[in-house]
Amino acid sequence: MKFITVAAALFASTSLAVPTNPNHGGSACVPNPHHGGSSTKSGPGGNPTGGNPTGSNTNTGPGGNPTGSNTSSSPGTRTTGGSTSSNPGPKPTSSNTRSGPATTTTGTKTGSNTSSGPATTSTGNPGPGGEFHCPRGLYSNLQCCATDVLGVVDLDCASPPTTPTSGDNFNAICAAVGKQAKCCVLPVAGQAALCQNPIGGNPPGGNPPGGNPPGGNPPGGNPPGGNPPGGPVCPSGLYSNAQCCATDVLGVADLNCDTPSKTPTSGADFTAICAASGQQAKCCVIPVAGQALLCENPTGGNPPGGNPPGGNPPGGNPPGGNPPGGNPPGGNPPGGNPTSSAPGSNPTNPPGGPVCPPGLYSNAQCCAVDVLGLADLDCDTPSQTPTSSADFRSICAADGQAAKCCVIPVAGQALLCQDPLGGNPPGGNPPGSSNPPGGSNPPGGSNPPGGSNPPGGNPPGGNPPGGNHVCPSGLYSNAQCCDVNVLGVANLNCAPPSTKPTSGKNFESICAAIGKGSMCCVVPLLGQAILCQRAII
């Protein structure tokens, strides 16, 4: 009787042991394409709950040592590798079973989830010989990206040089060129917007999602227009200005842009003219010398991304009432008269002395945050007038900031959005208060950018356009519901409210109903940044 009691105790201690599986010890957030699922028995006679099919591993007889990745054990069996389970009680009825005396078995999980034991197969993420895919839909484009901003914006992106066969292979391909593997919305050469990490290994739900193969059709379909009414290369309306641009940021802000050296006669000719100078053909909102904002691909051919964001150019006329190519908000057309008065002083005498170049980037600013060398945030006018570049740098450094020469001397923002009227936005005073950002006088001098009046006409705080009472008149007059806010600066995925707001609270509730935030914007489209360059050394 004692012998039976001791044997029963030994049997219980052996069958209830749960071994540690080194192959499944990582974080669930880290893609691991080697593991396509696990076969874990939940009770007597149960079927596996993971991704591997039942009956995939078969043992040949008592005492055998299977080498497959998934093993099951009857009472008295302990396993030390692979995916394991223990089933005290009746023998399961599936083919993943064996019976026999207490035995120790070992197994090794292979990269392709195919074990070496007899009659063993399993399925999971694509292995060697297959192709790795990003999820179907919006994030279907495989990209290797150099810079990730807050997990929202990925820059300096390109397609992988070879087709990945798995999540780990995708990571390795990108890591070899010093980049990160991403699944992106826009397959734009040199950059991509709205990226997420690629799915590999055991994504939520077990099975790897399908998707479009690399180099497939970009989202959006056909290019805008066909024969645009405004000319042969750019559509009429907001995006009517043909420009050759060197740098594309997010498919939205195009930098280092110039007017084509000659008038293009077609979309192909436009592309060729710009390519001759190492630039890209773009149709832009504001043709500012040295840079341009809010560009799209020209008419003709299949540009990356297809249609411009949101389909037709929003609004028709830009903020301020004048159409593109005419007078921009504030009076003189940007870049039209390079000797016109710049914010703060004459461009031939940059503000504060010889510290910033004349023209567009003439505003000396001390900035706290630099994003990718493009967007400078939390900026203020230097506490005293710099006398030299070294003095400029030291003045800013004393406040823990960096010396910058900026286009728009606006404190602490880049997309040019502000909170709507009504309530107290972060920072205390609501938009449209008597003092502009940065103090009693706007940065750059006693007059705001563009001359004595702020861009767009009346200063914020006047009567809102159309009497909607949610956004100030002038520069920030466009009510928008925006999805993503980056640093309180860049607002992405914006659209006009579905109904006309009657108050600030109503505006907020309209946007909140679709999971967005209420904003008052300069340009009712995706966002761009302040556009700063380094001070003259």
UniProtKB/Swiss-Prot annotation:
Disulfide bonds join C134-C183, C144-C174, C145-C157, C184-C195, C234-C283, C244-C274, C245-C257, C284-C295, C356-C405, C366-C396, C367-C379, C406-C417, C471-C520, C481-C511, C482-C494, C521-C532. Keywords: Cell wall, Disulfide bond, Glycoprotein, Repeat, Secreted, Signal. Residues 63-199 are annotated as: Hydrophobin 1. GO terms for cellular component: extracellular region. It comes from the Eukaryota. Residues 1-17 form the signal peptide. Transmembrane segments: none annotated. It holds the Pfam family Hydrophobin_2. Residues 422-537 are annotated as: Hydrophobin 4. Residues 200-299 are annotated as: Hydrophobin 2. It is found in: Secreted, Cell wall; Secreted. InterPro entries: Cerato-ulmin_hydrophobin, Hydrophobin_sf. Residues 300-421 are annotated as: Hydrophobin 3. Its main location: secreted. Glycans are attached at N70, N113. Aerial growth, conidiation, and dispersal of filamentous fungi in the environment rely upon a capability of their secreting small amphipathic proteins called hydrophobins (HPBs) with low sequence identity. Class I can self-assemble into an outermost layer of rodlet bundles on aerial cell surfaces, conferring cellular hydrophobicity that supports fungal growth, development and dispersal; whereas Class II form highly ordered films at water-air interfaces through intermolecular interactions but contribute nothing to the rodlet structure. Contains four hydrophobin units with the same cysteine pattern CX9-CCX11-CX16-CX8-CCX10-C, which is a little different from HYD1 and HYD2, but corresponds to the consensus defined for the fungal class II hydrophobins. Homotetramer. Further self-assembles to form highly ordered films at water-air interfaces through intermolecular interactions. Belongs to the cerato-ulmin hydrophobin family. This is Quadr-hydrophobin. It comes from Cordyceps militaris. The gene is QHYD.
